[in-house]
Amino acid sequence: MKLYINRNPVNGPWGGGNGATKAIFDHMVTNNLTCVGELPDTIIMLGLEREDNLGSLEELVSYKLKNPQTKLIIRVNDCDARKGTTGVDDRFLAASRHADGAIFVSEWMRDYFMNKGWACKNNTVIVNGVDQNIFKPFDGNTKPFENLRPKVVKIVTHHWSDNHMKGEDYYEMLDEFVGRNPYRFQYTFIGRTKAKLKNTQVVPPLWGKELGVALSQNDVCINASRFDPGPNSVIESIACGLPTYVHTEGGGGVEFAGHDHTFGTWDELENILTQKLLPNAFQTKTWQTFSDEVYSFLKGTSHD
């Protein structure tokens, strides 16, 4: 099987889409798949283009129309609600009329497009994986709040994108809260943000082992992102053993963190931070498992 992917993996602090691409590139050869640089006549997997992409969504649909034997697979990891854009939904919906299969990054992402008239009938949900050799509890501690609460609670947030939908309103309120309670709470923000933070340790974007170590040394992760299709930031903090709380409008983040780990107002978040913090029930998986699931779907689709 020859597989074409219209995106190249890169090293650095990027989102889950890059992690998924890298995992597929790393793993597919072991399953007798070949990632090729020219359009094949068998399988295509794609996402919305970036500057380094090898073919836009529309170009790959055009290729499919000219070569109907090609199996067109869409990985759906974006939407207009995520960043307040226009046109992203329409592009995916148009492509769904020609796709042979679609991989959604969360159930929320699937339901979002189904409610808008998604046309493809062969769909699956495959949640991103995580490198469990990197994102793991600090010193093997998997339940940091089982018996007692630390004297100073270390709060962390991490995002590689500084889009305002990532929750900067709550991060500014967190910053003010920590300023009022410096002997009870510390707040670290890792990544990019436009939030005005005075009492927060802001760390430039990290990735890989550096990010895993930095996350695991905290006590709780707060993620206020809205309408996030499948946030790897939530998966990574849970893998590090951190109780992770997300906004009620967090999109895919809610199904990862769990409905019992959500907040919809500042009062709710403050109450969470002053009570016993509980681990999430969500079980993360490796990128190997993710790639196995993708391969299984591709193989099944290619035989249809």
Protein language model features and the residues they cover:
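Extended catalytic core of nucleotide-activated donor transferases of GT-like folds
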Residues: 31-34, 39-98, 108
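A charged, aromatic-enriched C-terminal amphipathic alpha-helix characteristic of glycosyltransferases
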Residues: 267-304
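N-terminal pre-catalytic "stem/leader" segment of glycosyltransferase-like enzymes
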Residues: 1-51
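Conserved donor-binding/catalytic core segment of Leloir-type glycosyltransferases
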Residues: 144-166, 172-176
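Aromatic "clamp/platform" in nucleotide-sugar-dependent glycosyltransferases that forms part
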Residues: 226-227
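Donor nucleotide-sugar binding/catalytic pocket of nucleotide-sugar-dependent glycosyltransferases
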Residues: 100-114, 119-138
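Acidic anion/phosphate-binding donor-loop and adjacent secondary structure
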Residues: 84-86, 130-151
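Short hydrophobic beta-strand element within catalytic cores of glycosyltransferases
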Residues: 243-247
